[in-house]
Curated annotation (Swiss-Prot):
Upper classification of the organism: Bacteria, Bacillati, Bacillota, Bacilli, Lactobacillales
Subcellular localization, as worded in the UniProt entry: Cell membrane
GN (gene name): lgt
Key words of the record: Cell membrane, Membrane, Transferase, Transmembrane, Transmembrane helix
GO terms, molecular function: phosphatidylglycerol-prolipoprotein diacylglyceryl transferase activity
Assigned protein family: Belongs to the Lgt family.
Stored PROSITE patterns: LGT (PS01311)
Transmembrane segments annotated in the record for this chain: 12-32, 41-61, 80-100, 109-129, 167-187, 194-214, 226-246
Name assigned to this protein: Phosphatidylglycerol--prolipoprotein diacylglyceryl transferase
UniProt organism field: Streptococcus pyogenes serotype M1
Length: 259
């Protein structure tokens, strides 16, 4: 088993979980800051937004997780802030981040559609890297299986949990996000192939579809009244993305995404 603590200096412990999230964030900000000027948004606007959105998204992700695991946390109130042990829900972070983005664009008089198109590929990369934090913490895994011989030994060892090998759902989602990133980066380079806003819509449909399937393999899903919350949210994202594309294609005067 991999030690979840990457570095310890006296009482200060730096967890791999945090390093994975921060690594994803740094790469995402870099990519977004390079793309933003092409859409008339300064790199400084990206940095300013991240300084506001990232901490709020972490809080939102934690609140989302705690709400649906309240039966546990009501008895362990001291653990509510212990995010270094894992337990932040991506959908909580995405919802919070989207709300902050809309508020930021309104305040700075920026086009939110352009901002969302810039953010979507970067978010995919951040999620792909961040999922490895779940791997280190041995969370977000799937059902028990007899073997994982198709995977490298270090993954097999880390996925041996509670006496059984587990489906590495973290890996599936990480690769799914990475594949989505590659597709959209290639697609958006083709002239007049995507309308403004459709990169964001692609993200909603792509991530929602992958998460809908992968969530069904997991054994630690957040539940509400016996329902896997993330599957319903995923289905909602797909519907929103499809409706957005259909309406966008029917509208006249919508400009094409241009690099």
């Amino acid at each position: 088993m991999i030690n979840p603590i990457a570095l310890k200096c006296g009482p200060l412990a730096i967890h791999w979980y945090a390093l994975c999230i921060l690594s994803g964030l740094v790469l995402a900000v870099y990519l977004a800051s390079k793309e933003a000027p092409k859409k008339g948004i300064s790199s400084d606007a990206i940095f300013d937004f991240i300084l506001i959105a990232f901490p709020l998204a972490i809080v939102g992700a934690r609140i989302y997780y705690v709400i649906f695991e309240w039966s546990y946390y009501v008895k362990h109130l001291d653990e509510i802030i212990a995010i270094w042990n894992g337990g932040i829900a991506i959908y909580g972070g995405l919802i919070t981040g989207a709300l902050v983005l809309l508020a930021y664009c309104y305040n700075k008089v920026l086009n939110p559609i352009h901002f969302l198109d810039i953010a979507a590929p970067s978010v995919m990369v951040a999620q792909a890297i961040g999922r490895w934090g779940n791997f280190i913490n041995q969370e977000a895994y799937g059902k028990a299986v007899s073997q994982l011989n198709y995977l490298p030994s270090f993954i097999q060892k880390q996925m041996f949990i509670e006496g059984s090998y587990r489906i590495p759902t973290f890996l599936y989602e990480s690769l799914w996000n990475l594949l989505g990133f590659v597709i959209i980066m290639m697609w958006r380079r083709k002239p007049k192939s995507l309308l403004d806003g459709e990169i964001f819509a692609f993200y909603l449909i792509w991530y929602g579809s992958g998460r809908l399937v992968i969530e069904g393999m997991r054994t630690d899903s957040l539940m509400f009244l016996g329902i896997r919350i993330s599957q319903y949210v995923s289905a909602l994202l797909i519907i929103i993305g499809l409706i957005f594309v259909i309406k966008r294609r029917r509208q006249k005067g919508i400009s094409y995404y241009q690099e």
